[in-house]
């Protein structure tokens, strides 16, 4: 049986690599790519759906936009943040920590993926083995913050 998979965070390095690997797998029939990218183009095996991991309503709407009979063999969550282009960066000192930065990091790395589980787990295939997986980068690595 051909597989249907979802990759949440498909624009990041990890998510994009997972998508490329899945597209090369002949047993995969469809890949649903979820990201903040406003990409409405679809390829043969690929469907793009908007999702904002920081917004519960967006996560819910992403599942509501799925075709009614969609069942996933694999849901792969590859979201995460260590830094962004603006205000979030690895803290080298306790003085670098702020409420807003902590909320952003916790939302993207913990709360958002948990909410993805809330809304996406009902779409896992129940008639055969299915997998819900989370993977993030080495956010806790001291080598990344040059201490």
How would you describe each model-predicted region?
Residues 10-23:
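N-terminal Rossmann NAD(P)H-binding glycine-rich loop of SDR-like oxidoreductase domains
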Residues 19, 107-128:
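Amphipathic alpha-helical dimer-interface segment in Rossmann-like NAD(P)H-dependent oxidoreductases
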Residues 23, 27-41:
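Conserved glycine-rich Rossmann-like NAD(P)H-binding loop of the short-chain dehydrogenase/reductase
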Residues 44-57:
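Rossmann-fold cofactor-recognition segment
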Residues 71-72, 124-138:
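Active-site loop of short-chain dehydrogenase/reductase
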Residues 76-90:
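Conserved NAD(P)H cofactor-binding loop of Rossmann-fold oxidoreductase domains
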Residues 93-114:
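Catalytic Tyr-X3-Lys loop
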Residues 145-147:
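Conserved small/polar residues in nucleotide/adenosyl-binding loops
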């Amino acid at each position: 049986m051909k597989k249907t998979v979802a990759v949440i965070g498909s624009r990041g390095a990890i998510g994009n690599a997972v998508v490329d690997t899945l597209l090369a797998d002949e047993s995969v029939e469809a890949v649903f790519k979820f990201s903040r990218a406003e990409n409405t183009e679809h390829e043969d095996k690929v469907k793009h759906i908007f999702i904002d991991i920081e917004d519960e309503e967006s996560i819910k709407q992403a599942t509501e936009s799925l075709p009614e009979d969609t069942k996933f063999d694999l849901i792969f969550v590859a979201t995460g943040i260590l830094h962004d282009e603006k205000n979030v960066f690895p803290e080298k000192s306790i003085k670098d920590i702020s409420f807003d930065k902590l909320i952003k990091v916790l939302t993207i790395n913990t709360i958002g993926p948990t909410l993805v589980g809330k809304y996406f787990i009902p779409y896992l295939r129940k008639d055969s083995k299915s997998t819900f997986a989370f993977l993030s980068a080495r956010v806790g690595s001291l080598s990344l913050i040059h201490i």
